[in-house]
């Protein structure tokens, strides 16, 4: 095994309080500056790296949700979904 694989850290979870505070911060700004990473890490008792990775993961979750919503909105606007009778294109529901 490579040296990096042997020294891999376990999954570190945030407390409910930390998660709520990170979510509040994300709502204000999804991109933090290095200075803000430091401030948030000290306030929440997490490392700067944990803050940085949490925000990277949260932005990916945000983007995936947005991508899922766009096709649904297009289908709702008269796409190839159900007809007025509620029956799909192949006769099934």
Swiss-Prot record:
Gene3D superfamilies: Homeodomain-like
GO biological process, one term: anterior/posterior pattern specification
GO (cellular component) term, any one: nucleus
The keyword Lipid biosynthesis is annotated on this UniProt entry: no
Feature: DNA-binding region: 7-66
Subcellular location: Nucleus
Region of interest (Disordered), residue spans: 64-93
Annotated GO MF terms: DNA-binding transcription factor activity, RNA polymerase II-specific; RNA polymerase II cis-regulatory region sequence-specific DNA binding
SUPFAM superfamilies the record matches: Homeodomain-like
Role, per record: Sequence-specific transcription factor which is part of a developmental regulatory system that provides cells with specific positional identities on the anterior-posterior axis.
Family per similarity comment: Belongs to the Antp homeobox family.
Quaternary structure annotation from Swiss-Prot or TrEMBL: Forms a DNA-binding heterodimer with transcription factor PBX1.
Record's protein name: Homeobox protein Hox-B8
Species in which this protein is naturally found: Sus scrofa (Pig)
Phylogenetic placement of the source organism: Eukaryota, Metazoa, Chordata, Craniata, Vertebrata
